Amino acid sequence: MAANNNSDPILDEGGGGGVKHEAVGEAGEGKGGGGGAAATQAPAAMLPRSGSRPQLDLSGAAIHGNLEDRNPTILLPNQSDDISHLALDIGGSLIKLVYFSRHAEHSSEDKRKLSTKRRLGMLNGGRRSYPVLGGRLHFVKFETGKLNECLDFISSKQLHRGGVDSPSWRSGAQPDNIVIKATGGGAFKYADLFKERLGVSLEKEDEMDCLVAGANFLLKSIRHEAFTHMDGQKEYVQIDQNDLFPFLLVNVGSGVSIIKVDGHGKFQRVSGTNVGGGTYWGLGRLMTKCKSFDELLELSQRGDNSTIDMLVGDIYGGLDYSKIGLSASTIASSFGKTISDDKELSDYRPEDISLSLLRMISYNIGQISYLNALRYGLKRIFFGGFFIRGHAYTMDTISFAVNFWSKGEAKAMFLRHEGFLGALGAFMSYEKHGLDDLRIHHLVERFPMGAPYVGGKIHGPPLGDLNEKISWMEKFVQKGTQITAPVPVGFPVTTGMGGFERPTAKGDILRSDASAALNVGVLHLVPTLDVFPLLEDPKMYEPNTIDLDLNEYKYWFKILSDHLPDLVDKAVASEGGTDDAKRRGDAFAHAFSAHLARLMEEPAAYGKFGLANLLELREECLREFQFVDAYVSIKQRENEASLAVLPDLLMELDSMNEEARLLALIEGVLAANIFDWGSRACVDLYHKGTIIEIYRMSRKKMQRPWRIDDFDMFKKRMLADKKGQPYKRALLFVDNSGADVVLGMIPLARELLRNGTEVVLVANSLPALNDVTANELPGIVAEAAKHCGILRKAAEAGGLIFDAMAGIQDDLKDEPVSVPLMVVENGCGSPCIDFRQVSSELAAAAKDADLLILEGMGRSLHTNLNARFKCDTLKLAMVKNQRLAEKLFNGNIYDCICKFEPVP
């Protein structure tokens, strides 16, 4: 048995973990239990959600502190101070915790941001007040047998008192009568112990109520939550929120409960069966002498059920029964072959018995579930419960049964967070955090490293601060042990990491469950994120241009791995090259390599992952190890070099007529986009010349027609009405620092301003590679404005410059008062952009925009090449990757894209 015998709780900085299970527990406590009796009963009455839950008292509510704080605290003077941030699901084998932590960072608004918000109409009564604090939802599991460790964890973080960052904890107040929501049989069994150790009372929540509430929340709020599992392949399913209900929720515990869910808080238990996980474990224990559920599943990984089950081929001489559509490998009778065999129980391999038993029970659960779905006209069936636990073969078997009996009309679906349904439902029963008001775009899931995960086992205690995390990683590296993945979710210790072949009647091969298990991250609640309002069809929008199949994964993993040493060097240098920085740099390299190894092992581990997600994962990993901006010194140097030659460029542009100038500007944007530290080919160029030499070389190579060349169409639109303004407001999504923004996008912005178009420069909220950020742009614009009256007046009008720059001479000082030039952040810290989650400032700026310009590979090629918007859109990029050029355009590296998409 390859289970993890470590008794420590596992957490992913509050994220999911895996532990060894010695008891089933949950099922016998109501969730999925008692199935047999219910199977013959009439459907239960509709169960309403409890009305006794405490409500949020909003009387006298006011924003506390800075009125313009990014994530404002709402002061509730009449609210009692017993707000809890913790809920539990206490089963027989596992305790599941869901807890909330506030964001530590609270950014203050400077004068520029306030000016921009005021101009965008975000301060004049249009401001939303958020009933939920910006923060994180964490998911943690403990063995129920190690309950004291769970209590120690709660106490150390003061979760029962709102956490160590809560006002009540900081004030030293000792609130009386603290109540924590809990579900599961252990909520009754261990109530006295919680009172004794923590001084809290457990308020018991109905288990089925919590299951349904948890499932509804996940399906509503997590984009890649539900997935199908057929032939060992996971496929995430995007569910239309308007078409979610009704569905069937099948909870497989010791027995099986089948629940028809009609809406939020509206459900009924319509059926069940007494043949469930307890049946599998009980019969399996009798026949194989296995001591635990996980050991029994371990055996099934190496089983061959054809030695025990009677197959259709056994009856028909190895042939299919094609007349009724049965293949030779179909099971005709579970355990049927043992009838004619002159063998005793001891003559059969325990592995084969376990697999045959697993198939028998899983097939029947799938069939009964589909028959209930058919009865109520439902096509969507979600399965959960301890019996599922991310076990690849169990999911495959249930999926096969549903597909077979429905003739392909229905699909079995599973949930990535399925082990936390009850705890989530209990957490939501507080109705104090506004979770019911959250939408899918408010939640961002991230995957920090937890404990080192090696050889299918999690080693070591929960990782606390960063130093402890690094120390643990160094320990494994010193031993020469490869850290192969961050902490996975659910039940990764069911088997080892050997990738056992699993012979079946069909000869199928599935991975061991340690590699097939999915991961649960930390859910970041960001109520200031919005859907970009100019998306033509938000429901159909897919940011990633290329799906990452196995070959694509291998290619990009090699690219990222090869780039890693250089990135570490720059990250360490950005922190002064100190010993501490070197230590963190090494830890980052090991952590990100572990992420790559995990995704190579199971591409679906973190949900549906495209290249944009992969690139953002790298940036998040850098931030996890406290590297704020790895390219900061490089960006500063390139900005200074580019600003030095900007006056000459502007003078050259001003000597041209309007048509020639527009072409030169677009050529300049494309040429300057060559400066990308994320491209290996471009990095090699940096070693062969200065930034200006490379820029001039790139300009000389600008020969039309480009690979995609819609310039003439764009020119016609720009010059169509010389007397009026062709566009009211343009949003320019900028890319790299240095020449890219200074010699490319700023001159283009200047031309739009000259024509009377408001310009909003949109940049990253957080650093990513050498991309310019929204915090850096005002300083760059201010320097550029010293040499240009158009830029200076527009920057003053847009609040980017507040002090008059008297004494600065230029040839354009008599230009008329300009329309504003503004800067907003996009809400992300990635080289790409997902328009399903952008900052509220960007969403507000988009209201009056009628032109979008997406610049750079990340924002217009890797993502959004095929995206359609409600206004005219220009996509500009130089292709700096040969494989991408071939795959997208049958082109070559350094090809240019000028794609104009006007609205009808």
UniProtKB/Swiss-Prot annotation:
<dbReference type="GO" id="GO:0004594">
    <property type="term" value="F:pantothenate kinase activity"/>
</dbReference>
<feature type="short sequence motif" description="Subfamily II EGMGR motif">
    <location>
        <begin position="855"/>
        <end position="859"/>
    </location>
</feature>
<keyword id="KW-0479">Metal-binding</keyword>
<keyword id="KW-0547">Nucleotide-binding</keyword>
<feature type="binding site">
    <location>
        <position position="771"/>
    </location>
    <ligand>
        <name>Mn(2+)</name>
    </ligand>
</feature>
<keyword id="KW-0173">Coenzyme A biosynthesis</keyword>
<dbReference type="InterPro" id="IPR036075">
    <property type="entry name" value="ARMT-1-like_metal-bd_sf"/>
</dbReference>
<feature type="binding site">
    <location>
        <position position="736"/>
    </location>
    <ligand>
        <name>Mn(2+)</name>
    </ligand>
</feature>
<dbReference type="InterPro" id="IPR002791">
    <property type="entry name" value="ARMT1-like_metal-bd"/>
</dbReference>
<dbReference type="InterPro" id="IPR043129">
    <property type="entry name" value="ATPase_NBD"/>
</dbReference>
<dbReference type="GO" id="GO:0005829">
    <property type="term" value="C:cytosol"/>
</dbReference>
<dbReference type="GO" id="GO:0046872">
    <property type="term" value="F:metal ion binding"/>
</dbReference>
<keyword id="KW-0464">Manganese</keyword>
<feature type="region of interest" description="Disordered">
    <location>
        <begin position="1"/>
        <end position="56"/>
    </location>
</feature>
<comment type="pathway">
    <text>Cofactor biosynthesis; coenzyme A biosynthesis; CoA from (R)-pantothenate: step 1/5.</text>
</comment>
<dbReference type="GO" id="GO:0016787">
    <property type="term" value="F:hydrolase activity"/>
</dbReference>
<comment type="similarity">
    <text>In the N-terminal section; belongs to the type II pantothenate kinase family.</text>
</comment>
<dbReference type="InterPro" id="IPR015844">
    <property type="entry name" value="PanK_long"/>
</dbReference>
<feature type="binding site">
    <location>
        <position position="735"/>
    </location>
    <ligand>
        <name>Mn(2+)</name>
    </ligand>
</feature>
<dbReference type="InterPro" id="IPR004567">
    <property type="entry name" value="Type_II_PanK"/>
</dbReference>
<comment type="function">
    <text>Catalyzes the phosphorylation of pantothenate the first step in CoA biosynthesis. May play a role in the physiological regulation of the intracellular CoA concentration. Functionally redudant with PANK1. The phosphatase activity shows preference for normal or oxidatively damaged intermediates of 4'-phosphopantetheine, which provides strong indirect evidence that the phosphatase activity pre-empts damage in the CoA pathway. Hydrolyzing excess 4'-phosphopantetheine could constitute a directed overflow mechanism to prevent its oxidation to the S-sulfonate, sulfonate, or other forms.</text>
</comment>
<feature type="region of interest" description="4'-phosphopantetheine phosphatase">
    <location>
        <begin position="473"/>
        <end position="904"/>
    </location>
</feature>
<dbReference type="Pfam" id="PF03630">
    <property type="entry name" value="Fumble"/>
</dbReference>
<keyword id="KW-0418">Kinase</keyword>
<dbReference type="GO" id="GO:0015937">
    <property type="term" value="P:coenzyme A biosynthetic process"/>
</dbReference>
<protein>
    <recommendedName>
        <fullName>Pantothenate kinase 2</fullName>
        <ecNumber>2.7.1.33</ecNumber>
        <ecNumber>3.1.3.-</ecNumber>
    </recommendedName>
</protein>
<keyword id="KW-0067">ATP-binding</keyword>
<keyword id="KW-0378">Hydrolase</keyword>
<comment type="similarity">
    <text>In the C-terminal section; belongs to the damage-control phosphatase family. Phosphopantetheine phosphatase II subfamily.</text>
</comment>
<keyword id="KW-0533">Nickel</keyword>
<dbReference type="GO" id="GO:0005524">
    <property type="term" value="F:ATP binding"/>
</dbReference>
<dbReference type="Pfam" id="PF01937">
    <property type="entry name" value="ARMT1-like_dom"/>
</dbReference>
<dbReference type="GO" id="GO:0005634">
    <property type="term" value="C:nucleus"/>
</dbReference>
<keyword id="KW-0808">Transferase</keyword>
<feature type="region of interest" description="Pantothenate kinase">
    <location>
        <begin position="1"/>
        <end position="472"/>
    </location>
</feature>
<dbReference type="InterPro" id="IPR035073">
    <property type="entry name" value="At2g17340_3_helix_bundle"/>
</dbReference>
